[in-house]
Regions:
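Acidic-glycine-rich active-site phosphate/pyrophosphate-binding loop
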Residues: 1-15, 66-72
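ATP-dependent carboxylate/acyl-activation modules
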Residues: 3, 147-156
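Helical "substrate-binding/catalytic lid" subdomain
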Residues: 17-141
């Protein structure tokens, strides 16, 4: 049954280790999402459009499956390309913060990532997906990163 949802299954240890590893994995991917979002907003602000930005990153060393699905919202308006909600991202990053606190380590990048998602979560709507963070980060910085699809602006 697990094969239905998992690309691969790796046994990593004791009870609870899988959940902790999931939080670490999501921290890495959501950190990328926050970086992509801020980079896209800054790029647009200095005159580099999302398609021009993508033309440099795609097929280079920073290209990966996560980047490709993330960018499908901004470039194509594909709302369903990366179906993990901002609410779930914020929740996982809050759990990561608790895990770091319990372990007694500083978590400045995790907290910065969590705060990026906290703002998007608070602004709503509740059903927006992780790639829509770019639209939110753009908006709070006076940049319109709302994608168009079939000539129409998409909504988050």
């Amino acid at each position: 049954m697990l094969d239905t949802w998992a690309g691969r299954i790796v046994h990593i240890g004791d009870t609870g280790d899988g959940h902790r590893m999931k939080l670490l994995n999501n921290f890495i991917s959501l950190g990328y999402a926050a970086i992509y979002s801020e980079a896209l907003a800054l790029a647009e602000k200095v005159g580099i459009s999302p398609p021009r930005f993508d033309s440099v990153i795609r097929n280079g060393r920073m290209d990966c499956g996560f980047y490709q699905t993330f960018m499908r919202w901004t470039l194509e308006g594909d709302r369903d390309a990366h179906k993990f909600t901002i609410a779930n991202a914020f929740k996982d990053l809050t759990y990561l913060e608790s895990m770091a606190g319990a372990a007694g380590i500083a978590n400045p990048l995790g907290n910065a990532t969590k705060n990026a998602f906290a703002g998007a979560f608070a602004a709503g709507p509740a059903d927006q997906y992780v790639p829509m963070l770019a639209t939110h980060i753009g908006k709070v910085n006076g940049v319109d990163l709302t994608p168009t699809k079939d000539g129409k602006k998409q909504t988050t």
